[in-house]
């Protein structure tokens, strides 16, 4: 069977194609309305925002043919924004028309009791019948979600032949999937949901709609907040060594060279091989940080694109890439806006892009302009095209001590780690260019500005803790977590499993990232998750 995939110019569809091919099926693109009518099995991927997706479909004449196909009884699957597009419209794009397969309007999550976007691994189950798996979806499984808009379960009425699998996030219950024979629409990304997602995708492709289950597989794992787990993220700091090879390295307070006389770049292995290992060991996400990219033009950064392409062929969890996501000009003067640069990374297999120095410069201009949005920053243009969940800001702050809060205009915390002269307060100064240049902006100002511009997540590093194995900077993570309404990833300093428990329980951050300890296997991902599960932290196992 050949699987036809709708092509409307969206972001990372490569991973979906890779997953289908990994399972042994051929793929082909749908590029015109006639291709839809001829398809024997069709997948409608959803990457981007509702308006971009539905307007692109309308422009290409796909709306009505796709609607007819969805109702035809032939194998049909929709993913993420794809399930939203099956409804009449969305508050995300009030002037854009959906397919209208189902009645209703897509809504935005409220952030009264939670961060938005909803990012991470959550449950998805037909709660009225947990003794069965539908298209391989088991109540015990966790699937990867990344979205700010959803279809509320409350008030939803579908034809009786359809079953609804729901997901809980804070005070809201929404549609995680809609199923019937030969029909599967998921809010989660099966191609990014590890073995559970591959099982779901395979069940759809083989027509395995319904199977009885029992025991652990039938048990929902949730807490009072829902089924969303804390994420454990592995980070690969990638750069060229002195021989020109792309290697994974690790810094000690941002210094990546050995202390020996040769001072060579610290080499911890090949990026693709390590990425594959982390996937097999249970990493919930993998981050590639191209830490020397500010010295090069990313449009010509072929090795990094090749790493992404190869990793995405066999790694079925989210991949984030950072470094060089900005407006650039080629040596011949050809200009490439940041959204175009991001698009190249997405089409190579990235799910999210991480913006570092450019986020700081954009935040400075945001305040200079009286907190007015320009609409031209990398954060704004990328989030508009691909959704704010596709944009991560990577923050590199360093502690600056003061005797009393009045000694600075910046946001301070009372600290238990006294300064060199006994100072009891500090603020966190943001840096650019890999920590080599300091700017007059603090971490609260930066993250709030970036949230306003459309960033969907904060990757919070700490120059003081980097490579220390002494634990995360709890005061820093708590400060930022309490300052924004988007997810926060704690980074820098993890050395033992207890450090992960500490940062989750004391700050309620959404994810924790580590690099060196996973590279060297002084602490394994499995060890961290086993420890957290024993200590009542909900994780994907």
Swiss-Prot record:
Region (Cyclase): 228-541
UniProt keyword list: Amino-acid biosynthesis, Glutamine amidotransferase, Histidine biosynthesis, Hydrolase, Lyase, Multifunctional enzyme
Domain Glutamine amidotransferase type-1: 2-214
GO CC list: cytosol; nucleus
Entry EC no(s): 4.3.2.10, 3.5.1.2
Residues forming the catalytic site: 80, 189, 191, 237, 396
Function according to Swiss-Prot or TrEMBL: IGPS catalyzes the conversion of PRFAR and glutamine to IGP, AICAR and glutamate. The glutaminase domain produces the ammonia necessary for the cyclase domain to produce IGP and AICAR from PRFAR. The ammonia is channeled to the active site of the cyclase domain.
Listed name of the protein: Imidazole glycerol phosphate synthase hisHF
Organism (species): Schizosaccharomyces pombe (strain 972 / ATCC 24843)
Gene name in the database record: his4
């Amino acid at each position: 069977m050949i699987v036809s995939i709708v092509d409307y110019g969206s972001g990372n569809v490569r991973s979906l194609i890779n997953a289908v091919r990994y399972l042994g099926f051929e793929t082909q693109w749908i590029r015109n309305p006639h291709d839809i009518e001829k398809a024997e099995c069709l997948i409608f991927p959803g990457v981007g925002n509702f308006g971009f997706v539905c307007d692109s479909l309308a422009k290409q004449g796909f709306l009505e043919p796709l609607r007819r196909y969805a109702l035809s009884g032939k194998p049909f699957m929709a993913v993420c924004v794809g399930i939203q597009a099956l409804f009449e419209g969305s508050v995300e794009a009030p002037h854009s028309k959906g397919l209208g397969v189902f009645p209703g309007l897509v809504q935005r999550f409220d952030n009264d009791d939670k961060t938005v976007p909803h990012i991470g691994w959550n449950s998805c189950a037909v709660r009225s019948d947990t003794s069965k798996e539908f298209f391989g979806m088991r109540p015990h499984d966790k699937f990867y979600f990344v979205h700010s808009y959803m279809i509320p379960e409350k008030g939803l009425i579908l034809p009786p032949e359809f079953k609804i699998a729901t997901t809980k996030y804070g005070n809201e219950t929404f549609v995680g999937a809609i199923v019937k024979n030969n029909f599967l629409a998921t809010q989660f990304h099966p191609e990014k949901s590890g073995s559970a997602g591959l099982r779901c995708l395979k069940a759809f492709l083989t027509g395995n709609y319904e199977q009885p289950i029992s025991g652990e597989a039938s048990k929902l794992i949730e807490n009072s907040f829902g089924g969303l787990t804390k994420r454990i993220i592995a980070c690969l700091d990638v750069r060229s060594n002195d021989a020109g090879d792309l290697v994974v390295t690790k810094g000690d307070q941002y210094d990546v060279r050995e202390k020996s006389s040769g001072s060579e770049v610290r080499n911890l292995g090949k990026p693709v091989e390590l990425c594959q290992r982390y996937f097999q060991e249970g990493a919930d996400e993998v981050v590639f940080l191209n830490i020397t990219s500010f010295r090069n033009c990313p449009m010509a950064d072929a090795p990094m694109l090749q790493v992404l392409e190869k990793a995405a062929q066999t790694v079925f969890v989210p991949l984030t890439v950072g470094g060089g996501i900005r407006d650039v000009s080629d040596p011949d003067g050809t200009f490439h806006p940041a959204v175009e640069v991001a698009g190249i990374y997405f089409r190579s297999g990235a799910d999210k892009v991480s913006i570092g120095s450019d986020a700081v410069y954009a935040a400075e201009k945001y305040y200079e302009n009286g907190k007015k949005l320009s609409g031209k920053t990398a954060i704004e243009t990328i989030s508009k095209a691909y959704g704010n969940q596709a944009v991560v800001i990577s923050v590199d702050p360093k502690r600056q001590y003061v005797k009393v809060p009045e000694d600075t205009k910046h946001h301070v915390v009372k600290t238990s780690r006294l300064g060199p002269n006994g100072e009891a307060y500090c603020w966190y100064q943001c840096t650019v260019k890999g920590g080599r240049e300091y700017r007059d902006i603090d971490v609260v100002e930066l993250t709030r500005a970036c949230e306003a511009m459309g960033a969907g997540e904060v990757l919070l590093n700490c120059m003081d803790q980097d490579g220390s194995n002494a634990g995360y900077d709890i005061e820093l993570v708590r400060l930022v977590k309490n300052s924004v309404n988007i997810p926060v990833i704690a980074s820098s300093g993890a050395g033992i499993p207890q450090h992960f428990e500490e940062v989750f329980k004391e700050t309620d951050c959404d994810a924790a990232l580590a690099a060196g300890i996973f590279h060297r296997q002084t602490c394994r991902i499995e060890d961290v998750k086993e420890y957290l599960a024993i200590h009542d932290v909900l994780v994907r196992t």
